[in-house]
């Protein structure tokens, strides 16, 4: 431990915590949780279409409006400048209030890369706004508050909080932004340690309000659910989601159904979840087709 403390950890790849989490579980527990490390390339395949591309497309529309106003600016502070600046501030407010939820966040790799994506988009918009003649803002509005998580395993939930903070600080350091010092690290209570499907007192668990959902939910086949999760839990789960998720469906389908229901209700813009090929057949197919 003393030797490790003497090393420079400032450039650590935070995705390593996913490996630490997976290896920290005994094989039986890992099987029960369906817990497996998701590599950054796979995560980006979801982050791109769910978060990055839609936000960049929206920013391009805002930038075009700013550019049209910028062409009319005769001096800094005139009505055209103020209108252009107001558009940019409104855009920043949208980024500040944006929320990405991983309702099975494990050690936080999806949260880290979602946060990085948001910060990259904001940084890009700051640079373009400056090119169009607007003054640079003092600081960024995106940060750890933008990513929400739910994780049943207490160890993994704490790793997720550490992962997000390290990712935030590394990004700021790499892009020339100072660290906040008061406090140095806020608590990340919005990365919750609880069940994402069933509420503690019974019934369906609520998910926090978010713009998008991304993640790699646990997968566990129908025949293994009772053996791994217990009769009582499996019975309650299937009863709670009766009529929405067939009794023979894989555990991962419950996350798909909840995301689908929120999109249908207008409470969620998009969702991107990892699943195995088995989701395309049998009882699972009914959830996908819903």
Kindly give the residue locations of the regions a language model identified.
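Long recognition/docking surfaces used for binding and targeting
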Residues: 1-26
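SAM-dependent methyltransferase catalytic region
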Residues: 29-289
